[in-house]
UniProtKB/Swiss-Prot annotation:
CDD domains in UniProt: AdoMet_MTases
Location of the region described as tRNA MTase in the Swiss-Prot/TrEMBL record: 305-518
Catalytic reaction(s) noted: L-glutaminyl-[peptide chain release factor] + S-adenosyl-L-methionine = N(5)-methyl-L-glutaminyl-[peptide chain release factor] + S-adenosyl-L-homocysteine + H(+); guanosine(46) in tRNA + S-adenosyl-L-methionine = N(7)-methylguanosine(46) in tRNA + S-adenosyl-L-homocysteine
Assigned EC number: 2.1.1.297, 2.1.1.33
Active-site annotation: D421
Gene3D superfamilies: DNA helicase RuvA subunit, C-terminal domain, Vaccinia Virus protein VP39
Function in brief: Methylates the class 1 translation termination release factors RF1/PrfA and RF2/PrfB on the glutamine residue of the universally conserved GGQ motif.
Keywords: Methyltransferase, S-adenosyl-L-methionine, Transferase, tRNA processing
Protein name: Bifunctional methyltransferase
């Protein structure tokens, strides 16, 4: 028996509609187009055209698969992504339109379009042809749609793509042939970074599995029953992949390299925190067409470039290991600081860190921020923190002025400046931590009634600082009759002990910020 295109489509539409398919008419036409190999326009115009028995039989078989909720992309074996068709099957995740935002972001970065307020596909790529070569790593390539789209859009790029699934790699390789990019891509069977040796990349990109197992009951039948779970679900409430990437990515990035990741629409805060904890900057979060957070742009804090690596004695292997592995977890950033609810104390120039780490140990409910340019002292703090399980601190191994803009006004409960370099010679005095301009800045960072503690074993310097404080007029000196009395929980540091041995007397000035408003 023969049926017309109209009859077949109407029948299919009714069946698909009954099981809740969102666009039954469109899907029916897609299936029929796949069977007849005729354009959609033909099926719309020639509604009375009769179909052959072979075409009807083939269509019914495909329709039965769709009525079992098998995704239409798996039935046809094709899915469009970034205006190109990609081969797909049950071994790879079906490309989603939301992931196209990731492509937009990478293109924008590569062509120096860093201010992507809205993501839109680039139609003219003449400017791309003149850019520098970019070496890109994609983790978990699946069908290869991300890597191949980037290669097609950006002629001066090459890609190494990894995947743990051998079957997925077969699909990706088929797509590289389909889109003629085999000479610019290497696909490696690897679990994340395992088989990458010591290669370095300008960009690391990934759409990793990020769905929590607890969300399975909420997912569409098409997804949960047919798409590969290894590409969908992750442990740690869907965040496992981000932890793996954060832990390992730095060693594979070139200087100034970046990481571009797709994220779940409600995961931005948690993913940001993971990367902040590992010593990265969050450069930008991009939204999809539904205004959901979808793609995150990340760059590592590069200690060799961004931080003053001053070293007193040569660093031991243990110290270097602490700086490499532990310091990123405790690096100060304004993002970490923004949501802080605890009392906050800042110590400027903490030396070897004895006072700093002791204060943190005694006051576990207070956050201590330490500024110190000498990495020997930074490493010493990290060592003692690990030994005593102290975690209520952040470190800024750089010059003080570089952190001040990121400290909000009225945010600090106290500031310690203990035994700073006195810079005795007049022409060097402008280098002192406490000068007129910097004192004005620091007082604004203090809460009203917050404390500033200053100590020195150089008598002239101490009394010159008292004069500076009195000229400022916004501090009250506590215990001005007894400058020998230190503040609470003070311990004698190695430097202080050295001063005692050399017959120099340490004096302490405890100040209370007395300004009634900023």
């Amino acid at each position: 028996m023969q049926y017309s295109i109209k009859q077949i489509l109407n029948n299919a539409n009714d069946k698909l509609n009954k099981i809740g398919i969102n666009l039954p008419e469109l899907e029916a036409r897609i299936l029929l187009q796949h069977v007849t190999n005729k354009p959609i326009e033909h099926l719309l115009i020639k509604l009375n055209e009769q179909l052959s028995e072979a075409e009807i039989e083939a269509f019914e078989k495909l329709l039965e698969r769709r009525l079992e909720h098998e995704p239409i992309a798996y039935i046809t074996g094709i899915k469009e992504f970034y205006s190109r068709e990609f081969i797909v099957n049950k071994h790879v995740l079906i490309p989603r339109i939301d992931t196209e935002i990731l492509i937009d972001v990478v293109i924008g970065l590569v062509v120096s379009r860093n201010d992507l307020n809205t993501c839109s596909k680039l139609k003219s790529l003449d400017s791309v042809k003149t850019i520098q070569h970019y070496n890109i790593l994609e983790l978990g390539t699946g069908s290869g749609c991300i890597a191949i789209s980037l290669l097609c859009e950006l002629p001066n790029t090459s890609v190494i793509a990894t995947d743990i699934s051998v079957d997925a790699i077969k699909v990706a390789k088929s797509n590289t042939i389909k889109h003629n990019v085999t000479d610019r891509i290497q696909i490696i069977h690897s679990n994340w970074f395992e088989k990458l040796n010591k290669q370095k990349f300008d960009l690391i990109v990934s759409n990793p599995p990020y769905i929590s197992h607890s969300e399975k009951l909420e997912m569409a039948i098409e997804t949960i029953n047919y798409e590969p779970h290894i590409a969908l679900f992750a442990e740690e409430d869907g965040l496992e992949a981000y932890s793996i990437i954060a832990k390992n990515a730095k060693q594979f990035l070139k200087p100034n390299g970046k990481i571009i990741l797709e994220i779940g629409f409600s995961q931005a805060e948690k993913v940001c925190q993971i990367f902040l904890n590992y010593g990265y900057n969050i450069d930008h979060i991009y939204q999809d067409l539904q205004s959901h957070n979808r793609v995150i742009e990340i760059s590592p804090i590069n200690l060799n470039r961004s931080y003053a690596r001053r070293i007193g004695k040569s660093l031991s292997k243990m110290q270097q290991k602490l700086l490499d592995n532990e310091l990123p977890k405790y690096l100060f950033s304004k993002e970490k600081f923004a949501s802080e609810k605890r009392k906050i104390f800042l110590e400027i120039g903490f030396g070897m860190g004895e006072h700093f780490i002791n204060q943190a140990k005694i006051n576990p409910d207070t956050l201590f921020i330490g500024v110190e340019v000498y990495l020997n002292g930074v490493a010493n703090v990290l060592k003692h923190a690990a030994q005593h399980n102290i975690m209520n601190f952040l470190l800024f191994p750089n010059n003080l002025d570089l952190i001040l803009n990121d400290l909000p006004n009225n945010s600090l409960d106290g500031i310690y400046i203990l035994f700073p370099d006195p810079w005795i010679k007049n022409k060097k005095k402008k280098k002192r931590i406490l000068n007129k301009e910097r004192l004005n800045i620091l007082q604004n960072k203090l809460k009203n009634n917050g404390n500033l503690v200053f100590a020195s074993d150089i008598e002239n310097y101490f009394y010159e600082t008292i004069t500076l404080i009195r000229q400022n007029g916004n501090f009250e000196i506590i215990h001005n009759d007894d400058y020998l009395k230190p503040h609470d929980n003070y311990i004698i540091t190695k430097y202080h002990q050295k001063a005692i041995n050399e017959n120099r007397t340490a004096k302490f000035m405890i100040l209370q910020h007395a300004l009634t408003g900023h």
